[in-house]
Amino acid sequence: MKWNLVTFADDKFLNRQKYIEEYAKSLDIGTYSYSHSWFKKQDFYKKYKNILLDKTGLGYFLWKSYIINDAINQMEDGELLFYTDVGDIFHEDLIPFVEEVIEEDSCLLMVGNSINKDWTRRDCFVYMDCDEEDYWDSNQLEAGISFWRVCDESKKIISEWLEYACDRRIISDDENVGGKDNFPSFQEHRWDQSILTNLAIKHGLSVAPQDIRSYIECNYDYWYERYANGGAPMHRPIDTLLQQKKGEMMKLYES
């Protein structure tokens, strides 16, 4: 199975993007590296400036579904698209693990520990026609890493993700206008992640088993902070990789 890594970075994180891109190439993974400066030149950016000019997530992370949609439509059926935030890192054994688990599914998504209604504005539920208990009480996904098998079904889901993300009522931090209040336990909206979670529940999309976390580390700068204080895990393959690459990766974190 041919793998393709998709990443995005603004000027502040171009060094991290370059690092993970070179790492992916060393594993014979293709790369689709998008920059914020490139994104701002697209007609799409001009059309949705009302969302994309917001400083939160460079426009509530709307760019994420856009670049994934752009990249997957350049790939051949049967290939695998792997999106990751540039602040994350993965162990090479992730590749056979995902290939075994994903099988013929259209995608493989990461589930977190947070409850969806605690991190999703009510309008996101309302305007996605997802204002029901199943959506409220499910665990929210983590959109910083996702895997997509290139096929018609995955393209349709990503296109739907992008379509909902273009609706400011759904993706933004604005006050609700749909006539319903946020839940009492609401903390903060999670933008693209809230949308993807609702879609995953609606379409019954596959989520990865917890074992996948043996091969990935999200926000590796935080891992090094815990490592310095003696609080980082040390038993996973990804922990070994982080120890081996500490010097070079800490330079990325500090620069």
Language-model features and meaning:
Residues 1-255:
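Glycosyltransferase catalytic domains, chiefly GT-A lineage
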